[in-house]
């Protein structure tokens, strides 16, 4: 019970810190807010709104199209595309931004060729359209994966029934497949939208005026804590609305699954239409372009940048000069910091997740304890949707207030001069990932196992440690892996809370790209992609296992 109470305080503190800043408004703060509403806030609202709207539509369109192609048709190469379409999940949008900025620069081969064909032609990828493009082609796998599962479970039989009734193919897709996949597409688009709102790397690198860049600028540049809290609370409100909408769509998905499951078991396996000739080529293009634009091309660009930088470094000596950041010792330090943060956060997250899930399973609590437990579970599930910059500000605001009231505590130094603050932010944001994995593992352990252990005289601690942990080791390993990878890729919380002179792969890649040193940023960026590939491979294997 003590762990549950501690977890409730830890998760709720950043949210309460942001909301509590509104109670500290004085006349100067109100005047500052009025000025912001007349100057910067409209720009934040317009840019963030357009980005959210277009990314949502783009992710639903691309994810839904490839899900229909993979789930409802047979064509040569389908098995390859079914897992290759997940590869962009390993590519953070800010890493993709570094690659395309170099590839599409004014002096590059692409714009040079286009200007040769069309004199006077020019464009700049570092703008709102470029950001929308990057987010769509790195985040569409969320919608693709959920829509593919929905269509594979229920769509094939309904499409076959519509075909036997003489419905044309186009009408079958529009009137059967798309309505069936709509809740899944909405849920996937909501997840992609949360990732978009939480992004700092793309917005900062492209110079966009979004809420995340506004939070960072208000805190780090203007030293305006009240403004940072106001921006963070506005973003938090938007995320809460998104969570409510996403939960509604998830309920509709479960309702559809219950209704459609009964009819799927009885009949023979439905025959999928086989595509050949021009239709097969079209299917290859539809499925191949997202993989090419969201993963293959950025990786090739980064490899070319790294190879070029490696050649230039070799001419002056691998350790030559203080300007060269490609020394092995520095790179090893960035990797060590990333893995150290990821390992510590993953270890604590699985302990908290196991404690929370075991308490929910064991029951036997008072009414107040049960209410607290449900509240903690709801807060933990909300944590992943909260942007890292919002969590960082929510941590720093109470710390700054406590430091002013109680200077001898040195709490600010403890959180910002050590790894404690950044690990805390990771736990608030990513404990939800561990909880979901452990909950899924507990569904495979019958309650009768616990009853038998209690009959034999085992205590709660013995049941959890000696019985559940061995049975849950796969789920615990998956939870640790997911948290570890998310920590390695996390940028805004790390930028705000990391100890002085402690750079991770994400931070150093951002700093080098910001200084237009893209060749030097390529190796850290590729390392992040390589780490991100691990959970994607796990998902691919799980899908193949379930299919078989």
Indicate residue ranges for each PLM-predicted region.
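Feature of multi-pass inner-membrane transport and sensor proteins
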Residues: 155-156, 171, 202, 208-213, ...
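Internal catalytic domains of large membrane-associated glycosyltransferases
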Residues: 141, 159-161, 171
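Short glycine/proline-centered loop/turn elements that form peptide/ligand docking sites
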Residues: 154-157, 445-449
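Peri-membrane helix termini and adjoining interfacial loops of integral membrane proteins
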Residues: 21-33, 105-117, 206-212, 254-265, ...
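Polytopic alpha-helical membrane proteins, predominantly small-molecule transporters/carriers
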Residues: 45, 166-167, 175
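The alpha-helix within a helix-turn-helix
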Residues: 162-163, 453
